Each structure stands twice: as structure tokens, then as C-alpha cells.
Amino acid sequence: MKAKVLKSKIANRLKRKRRIRAKISGCASLPRVSVFRSNRYLSVQAINDATATTLTSLSSKATGHKANKEGGAALGAAFAAKLKEVGISQIVFDRNGYQYHGVIAAFGDALRENEIKF
């Protein structure tokens, strides 16, 4: 991919990210779950925006999964268990400007299957 095209794709994702973040916010009882996807790994964290603290986080690098649909689903199930340990059953999902398909959708579906509402 040419550098100019790559820069515009990244700039467009960051614009989408800012639009999304202007509309959603998390608190202690309803945290924002932010997803970051790289080519190799997937990272997620539950954030309380009122105090700007991370409640819990998990990465596919730590769990040994890859950033594909199967890895996203496994990470979603593991993160749902971690959220339940902290006592969280409902979240606000922040897809971070990524399209809701593929690995991001697999992660979200795994959260829903494990009774996390968003």
C-alpha cells in the first residue's frame, strides 16, 4: 500500500474515533470498553472516564491468541470473565474507529454470549 493511501486510511480512522468518543463515555458502573487492533495482537481495556482510570485490561499478547476471529472470540470470553470478577455486567463498547466486522465483531459477540450487555 502506498504511503499516501495508508496515511489517509489512518487519518480517516482517527476521525471516526473522535466522532465516536464525542458521543460515548464510561463511568464506574457502566465502563467504556476500548478495543485496539494491530496486525498481530488485540488489546482491550475497561475504562472509567469520570476518574480517567483503567478498571481492567487484557491483551492477546498475554493470552497467546492472535488477532484473528478465533483469537478475538477467545479474548472476548476471557475478558468477559475478567469483567465479571470486577462485578461489571454492562458496558459501553468503543470500537475505536474500526469497522464492526471480523475480529472486532467476534470479540463483541463473545462478550454478548458471556452475558455482558452493551
From Swiss-Prot:
GO terms for biological process: translation. Coiled coil: none annotated. Keywords: Ribonucleoprotein, Ribosomal protein, RNA-binding, rRNA-binding. The keyword Thylakoid does not apply. One of its GO terms (molecular function) is 5S rRNA binding. The keyword Oxidoreductase does not apply. GO terms for cellular component: cytosolic large ribosomal subunit. Pfam families: Ribosomal_L18p (PF00861). PANTHER family: 39S RIBOSOMAL PROTEIN L18, MITOCHONDRIAL, LARGE RIBOSOMAL SUBUNIT PROTEIN UL18M. This is one of the proteins that bind and probably mediate the attachment of the 5S RNA into the large ribosomal subunit, where it forms part of the central protuberance. NCBIfam families: L18_bact (TIGR00060). Part of the 50S ribosomal subunit; part of the 5S rRNA/L5/L18/L25 subcomplex. Contacts the 5S and 23S rRNAs. Belongs to the universal ribosomal protein uL18 family. This is Large ribosomal subunit protein uL18. The lineage of its organism: Bacteria, Pseudomonadati, Campylobacterota, Epsilonproteobacteria, Campylobacterales.
